[in-house]
C-alpha cells in the first residue's frame, strides 16, 4: 500500500524438498513424496487465493482511494480494492489484526450489486459467508481479528477438495540405473544441494549420472560458503539407519564420494571419498575417521563403492574388498553422491537391507 507494489513472487509455489534439507518448508504447499503422491495444502495457498480468485493481473487495477491501513503506525491491518477494467465489478481484500467495523460506500462506476464474502483465519481457510445486499450504495460489515476477507461482486470462487493419497516412506530397498531418463534430464528422486547432476551417456551407450558444474557458482547466502561443501546430491529417507548402499563410479578428475546417514544440505554424515590416484578418506561431518591409499588403483576404469551401516559399525568396500572399518556413532539420514568440480560419473545405485 505504501509503495504501491502490485506483484508478489512465491518461492517456490510447491515445495518438493527432502526433510531436513535447507528450505524444506518453503512454498505455498508441500509435495515432497512423488513416489506416493501425498501432498499438503498449507494455509498460504488460501491466503493467496484471497487475491488470485478475485482479480487477474491482466484486467484488474488497484483503486488508490480505496486502499488503506487500519493503523498506519503498525501496518498490521490493511485494505486493498481492485476494479475490473472491462466492467463495474470490484473486489476488496482485507487483513485484520483486531476486531473492526468497516463501512463501505460504493462510488459511481462500481457495481452496486450483491457482495459475496469469503473469509480465512488460522482455523478455517477460504470459507464463503453470507452475502451482503448494499442499501443506498452502502453497507457495514463486522470483521474478526487476525483474519483475511475478500468482498467481491464477482462469482466463480471455489475451494477445491480432493482425496489426498496416503503418505508413504521412500521405497526400500531401492535401485537406480538411470535408464528411465533422457540424456540431460534430472535423475528421479535425487535432490542436488550444490553443483548439478544430470543424466549422461556412458561409452557403452547406457545411461549414468554426471556432475556437470565446472566450478563453484556465487553463493548468495553465507551459510553455503563453507569450505567442506562441494557438489552433492541426496536420495532416500532421512530416517534410514541400518542399510548398505553401493554405486559404481568413474573418476574423471579430483575425487568422488559415496555417503550415508547424511542430513541437511552441508554434507553432515558419513562419507567415503576416493581420488583418481586411489587415496581415500572416511569422513564423518568434518572429522576424518580413517585414511589411506589403495595400492595399484586404476583411476581410468569404473569402480564400485559400498558402505555398510549397522548401529555404530561402519564398513567401506571398494570393488567388494573391505578398505576400512569404524566404530563411531549411530545416526540416520540419506544416501549421497558428491564430487569435486569435475565431470565425474555415478551409476547403479543400490540401497538394501543388511545381510
Regions found by a protein language model. Give the residues of each.
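Short, solvent-exposed beta-strand-to-loop segments that form ligand-recognition rims
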Residues: 317-338
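Short tryptophan-centered beta-strand motifs in secreted/extracellular beta-sheet-rich domains
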Residues: 178, 245-247, 301-310, 314-316
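Short, aromatic/His-centered strand-loop micro-motif at the edge of beta-sheets
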Residues: 284-304
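C-terminal beta-strand-rich structural cap/linker in extracellular carbohydrate-active enzymes
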Residues: 132-166
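Secretory/extracellular carbohydrate-interaction modules
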Residues: 204-206, 211-282
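Carbohydrate-binding surface patches
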Residues: 65-113
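Extracellular carbohydrate-recognition regions
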Residues: 159-198, 355
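Aromatic/acidic polysaccharide-binding cleft in carbohydrate-active enzymes
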Residues: 1-75
Amino acid at each position: 500500500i505504501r509503495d504501491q507494489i502490485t506483484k508478489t513472487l512465491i518461492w517456490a509455489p510447491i515445495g518438493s524438498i527432502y526433510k531436513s534439507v535447507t528450505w524444506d518448508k518453503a512454498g505455498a504447499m508441500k509435495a515432497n513424496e512423488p513416489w506416493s503422491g501425498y501432498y499438503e495444502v498449507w494455509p498460504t495457498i488460501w491466503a493467496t487465493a484471497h487475491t488470485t480468485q478475485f482479480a487477474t493481473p491482466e484486467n484488474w487495477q488497484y483503486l488508490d482511494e480505496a486502499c488503506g491501513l487500519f493503523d498506519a503506525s503498525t501496518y498490521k491491518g490493511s485494505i486493498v480494492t481492485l476494479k475490473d477494467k472491462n466492467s463495474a465489478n470490484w473486489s476488496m481484500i482485507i487483513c485484520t489484526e483486531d476486531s473492526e467495523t468497516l463501512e463501505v460506500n460504493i462510488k459511481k462506476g462500481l457495481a452496486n450489486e450483491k457482495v459475496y464474502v469469503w473469509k480465512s483465519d488460522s482455523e478455517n481457510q477460504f470459507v464463503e459467508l453470507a452475502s451482503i445486499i448494499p442499501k443506498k450504495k452502502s453497507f457495514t460489515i463486522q470483521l474478526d481479528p487476525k483474519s483475511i476477507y475478500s468482498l467481491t461482486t464477482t462469482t466463480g470462487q471455489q475451494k477445491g477438495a480432493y482425496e489426498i493419497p496416503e503418505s508413504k516412506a521412500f521405497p526400500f530397498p531401492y535401485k537406480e540405473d538411470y535408464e528411465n531418463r533422457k540424456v540431460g534430464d534430472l535423475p528421479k528422486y535425487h535432490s542436488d544441494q550444490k553443483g548439478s547432476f544430470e543424466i549422461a551417456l556412458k561409452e557403452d551407450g547406457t545411461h549414468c549420472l554426471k556432475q556437470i558444474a565446472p566450478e563453484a557458482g556465487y553463493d548468495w547466502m553465507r551459510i553455503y560458503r563453507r569450505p567442506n561443501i562441494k557438489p552433492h546430491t541426496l536420495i532416500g529417507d532421512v530416517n534410514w539407519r541400518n542399510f548398505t548402499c553401493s554405486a559404481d563410479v568413474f573418476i574423471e578428475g579430483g575425487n568422488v564420494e559415496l555417503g550415508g546417514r547424511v542430513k541437511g544440505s552441508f554434507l553432515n554424515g558419513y562419507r567415503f571419498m576416493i581420488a583418481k590416484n586411489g587415496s581415500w578418506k572416511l569422513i564423518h561431518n568434518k572429522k576424518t575417521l580413517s585414511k589411506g591409499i589403495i595400492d595399484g588403483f586404476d583411476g581410468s576404469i569404473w569402480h564400485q563403492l559400498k558402505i555398510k551401516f549397522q548401529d555404530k559399525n561402519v564398513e567401506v568396500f571398494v570393488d567388494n574388498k573391505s578398505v576400512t572399518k569404524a566404530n563411531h556413532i549411530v545416526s540416520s539420514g540419506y544416501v549421497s553422491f558428491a564430487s569435486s568440480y569435475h565431470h565425474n560419473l555415478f551409476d547403479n545405485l543400490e540401497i538394501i537391507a543388511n545381510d
